[in-house]
């Protein structure tokens, strides 16, 4: 198995419904996403994947949906819609609280399989840094 990793950075805001400290309030992070993909063999050029393809597909999706957006729990739709209508702010809703864990799981299990379904590689690992010192891995 041969693995390759691509790093993507994006800025987004979120809040955690029901959290008992400051994370219950709207706040933002400079997220760093590391996507590790794997294949059994390289292609005829000796690559698992052209890193440009990962950039085009994964970073393209992240830029369109997450970058400079609010990532909210679908239970926060009232707040999200008010912010969106007053400011034009992009809002992305998750089924669960937008913790780093849930964002990483959403990307690995729901988004990336669809983005990469026609490719000869698969996503093995997602690492999402919420801060330079804190990350989750799925």
Curated annotation (Swiss-Prot):
GO molecular function, one term: metal ion binding
Enzyme nomenclature, EC number: 4.1.2.50
Pathway membership: Purine metabolism; 7-cyano-7-deazaguanine biosynthesis
Name under which the protein is recorded: 6-carboxy-5,6,7,8-tetrahydropterin synthase
Cofactor requirement: Zn(2+)
Pfam families: PTPS (PF01242)
Major enzyme class: lyase
UniProtKB keywords: Lyase, Metal-binding, Queuosine biosynthesis, Zinc
Residues that, per the record, bind Zn(2+): 14, 27, 29
Protein role: Catalyzes the conversion of 7,8-dihydroneopterin triphosphate (H2NTP) to 6-carboxy-5,6,7,8-tetrahydropterin (CPH4) and acetaldehyde.
Residues spanning the membrane: none
InterPro entries linked: 6-PTP_synth/QueD (IPR007115), 6-PTP_synth/QueD_sf (IPR038418)
Catalysed reaction equations from the record: 7,8-dihydroneopterin 3'-triphosphate + H2O = 6-carboxy-5,6,7,8-tetrahydropterin + triphosphate + acetaldehyde + 2 H(+)
Note: The active site is at the interface between 2 subunits. The proton acceptor Cys is on one subunit, and the charge relay system is on the other subunit.
Gene3D superfamilies hit by this protein: 6-pyruvoyl tetrahydropterin synthase/QueD (3.30.479.10)
Native species: Rickettsia bellii (strain RML369-C)
Record carries keyword Transport: no
Cofactor details (free text): Binds 1 zinc ion per subunit.
Family membership: Belongs to the PTPS family. QueD subfamily.
Active site annotation, chain numbering: 23, 68, 130
């Amino acid at each position: 198995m041969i693995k390759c990793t691509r790093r993507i950075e994006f800025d987004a805001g979120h809040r955690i419904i029901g959290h008992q400290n400051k994370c219950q309030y709207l706040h933002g992070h400079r997220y760093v996403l590391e996507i590790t993909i794997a294949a059994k063999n390289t292609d005829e050029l000796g690559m698992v994947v052209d890193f440009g393809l990962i950039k085009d597909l994964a970073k393209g999706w992240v830029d369109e949906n997450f970058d400079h957006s609010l990532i909210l729990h679908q239970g926060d739709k009232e707040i999200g819609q008010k912010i969106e209508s007053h400011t034009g702010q992009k809002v992305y809703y998750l089924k669960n609280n937008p913790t780093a864990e849930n964002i990483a799981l959403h990307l690995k299990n729901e988004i990336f399989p669809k983005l990469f379904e026609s490719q000869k590689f698969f996503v093995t690992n997602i690492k999402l840094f919420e801060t330079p010192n804190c990350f989750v891995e799925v």
